[in-house]
């Protein structure tokens, strides 16, 4: 394997930066927040796959969709109900029988109940990373700084970055896409500058970041106050493009790209090809984003029948799932959809320290019970479910004991993961918890095991080593093992 390359030669970036500024293509940080990376240039993909030591991986799953239930969904109120537990533990909800004999889940997820014979439910996800960052569920690494509100370049790369490192996916599409925005964007009014660690290239470099979509949600009503009457986010994820950069057009960008390519030929006389791969990737991203019809088409929901759009529910997250399906059709290997906190306007997170039951009943569970079955049915009807692995989980579970504000608090000791498609065994329940769903009773599963299982389905050996920033070998699944019996 090759070391991660160092910075470009000292003299080249200032020259190119000056050119970009003069030509009007010097974008500010706010203008490129959704343009973080599009690493799907054909030649570089083939080079990366070659440098990684083999051809592109090929497994049962060709694409993975993560639905990150940001905040920490309650295992006790969703998929691991304990009707015999004391009232201060079991909560207000009743259970219903699912399509999988012997399995009962929350009464407020009737559509999901009807598809459980197609899924594997893992009830014993456990770790010690008490944080709302999706770092652990996207990388398998649970030793990060739980207080971090921005990614660290030394963080391990997520699944999408590893897919890109191995050159997966078509040459004219990004290797990973993050919807509806980077995690933390909706919280920026409370925590300026927040970008929750997780969906990044990390130690592989920012060139392996996903393409971050943009969003500007509206809400179905004005919320009263947080945790009491929060509104549902509406709208669609948007592809960054010319509209995000004032005065930038495709024709103008093509001219600038032509000039930059001429400059690149001069740089090649004094720099190695590895250095050039790190030279202002923005120019390639912007060109591809603005001119490639395939990726723009994937974000164009007007191409979908109204009847199908209604099945997804019309919320921002329903539309994210529909875009995710379109990205799967286009061959994108890794798509992550993140519940987001848009306070004070609205929220779709599971961090319910207050009013847990009303929020779940009236807000979160109806949305989840709409968008997930719609996605599964849509993929299945198109013959894509067997090659698309969906995993649904949050970064932790919730505390068994209900607090004085009718909420549940953080509880990383026990949570769940739901897996569907992509060669995962249908109709399975893995692991058993104790009487209050506080701790695993058998078969504990770490986030690293979840990630290792996903790599296996993608055709990537979970024990593969890739270089960190210092060129030292680093395991992609951080010691995780594929979960036995579900693949």
Regions found by a protein language model. Give the residues of each.
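Ligand-binding pockets and gating/stacking loops
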Residues: 2-487
């Amino acid at each position: 394997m090759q070391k991660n390359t160092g910075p470009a030669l000292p003299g080249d970036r200032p020259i190119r930066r000056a050119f970009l500024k003069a030509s009007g293509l010097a974008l500010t940080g706010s203008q490129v927040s959704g343009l973080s990376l599009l690493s799907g240039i054909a030649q570089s993909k083939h080079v990366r796959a070659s440098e990684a030591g083999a051809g592109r991986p090929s497994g049962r799953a060709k694409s993975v969709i993560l639905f990150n239930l940001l905040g920490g969904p309650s295992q006790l109120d969703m998929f691991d109900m304990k009707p015999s537990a004391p009232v201060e533990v079991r909560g207000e909800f009743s259970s219903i029988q699912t399509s999988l004999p012997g399995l009962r889940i929350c009464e407020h997820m009737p559509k999901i109940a009807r598809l459980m014979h197609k899924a594997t439910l893992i009830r014993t996800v456990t770790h010690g990373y008490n944080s709302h960052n999706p770092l652990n569920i996207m990388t398998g690494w649970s030793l990060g700084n739980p207080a971090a509100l921005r990614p660290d370049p030394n963080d391990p790369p997520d699944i999408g970055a590893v897919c890109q490192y191995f050159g997966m996916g078509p040459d004219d599409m990004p290797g990973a896409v993050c919807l509806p925005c980077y995690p933390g964007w909706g919280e920026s009014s409370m925590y300026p500058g927040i970008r929750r660690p997780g969906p990044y290239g990390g130690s592989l470099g920012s060139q392996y970041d996903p393409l971050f979509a943009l969003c500007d949600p509206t809400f179905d009503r004005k919320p009263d106050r947080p945790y009491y009457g929060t509104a549902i986010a509406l709208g669609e994820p948007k592809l960054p493009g010319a509209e995000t950069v004032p005065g930038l057009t495709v024709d103008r960008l093509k001219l600038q790209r032509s000039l930059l390519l001429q400059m690149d030929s001069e740089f090649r006389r004094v720099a190695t090809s590895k250095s050039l791969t790190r030279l202002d990737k923005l120019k390639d991203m912007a060109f591809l984003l603005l001119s490639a019809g395939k990726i723009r088409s994937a974000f164009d929901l007007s191409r979908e029948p109204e009847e199908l759009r209604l099945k997804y529910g019309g919320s921002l997250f329903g539309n994210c799932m529909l875009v995710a399906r379109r990205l799967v059709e286009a061959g994108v290997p890794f798509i992550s959809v993140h519940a987001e906190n848009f306070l004070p306007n609205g929220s779709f997170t599971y961090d319910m320290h207050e009013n847990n039951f009303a929020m779940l009943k009236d807000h979160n569970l109806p949305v989840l019970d709409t968008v997930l079955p719609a996605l599964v049915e849509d993929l299945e009807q198109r013959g894509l479910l067997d090659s698309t692995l969906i995993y649904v989980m949050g970064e932790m579970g919730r505390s068994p004991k209900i607090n004085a504000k009718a909420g549940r608090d953080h509880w990383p000791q026990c949570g769940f993961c739901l897996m569907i498609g992509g060669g995962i065994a249908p109709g399975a329940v893995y692991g058993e918890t104790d009487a209050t769903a506080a701790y695993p009773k058998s078969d504990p599963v770490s986030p690293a095991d979840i990630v290792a299982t996903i790599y296996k389905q993608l055709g990537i050996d979970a024990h593969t080593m890739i270089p960190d920033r210092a060129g030292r070998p680093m395991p992609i699944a951080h010691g995780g093992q594929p979960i036995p019996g579900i693949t």
